[in-house]
Amino acid sequence: MLETDVVDRIRAIFLHEQPYVTINEAARMLGWSGSEMIRAIRDGEIELTTTCSGERFDIRELAEKAIDLWTLQVIEKALGREASLILPPGVRTQKLELRLPAYQVAALRVLAGDASESVDTMLERMFLELADNERERLSGVIPDLAEAIAWPRQPITPQAS
């Protein structure tokens, strides 16, 4: 069961109707303190955009950061029915069951632990990198690949399924 505040933050980001949010709104949506947000801006982890209303965050920038904070499975679950409207078909999760030698499972657990992430998160990131590296070859056989790899940098707007 997902914590209510995590669900609320994810939904606030992915279902946000405006293209930009203030620094304070962004910090609240990500669950960060003001000092964490200032550090992230200073370190280039997240970039501000200058708008006619001043410096703001593009909601897509927050969506990218959300993907770093939560797995796609968590995001999809938090979005509930709206997931099919927000997540492109190639991004929606599917269950994959596999069997690996014990040493590979142990290695995955150690490496994920070293990176302070779950095995699912680590594998999700590794497969994204693999698909991106093999994009040219895979694009011809996986119709939604380019859109899936580009997401969420493309506009986050509800789509008909």
Outline where the language-model segments fall.
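Short amphipathic alpha-helix starts
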Residues: 23-31, 38, 94-108
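Short, charged, intrinsically disordered terminal tails
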Residues: 133-161
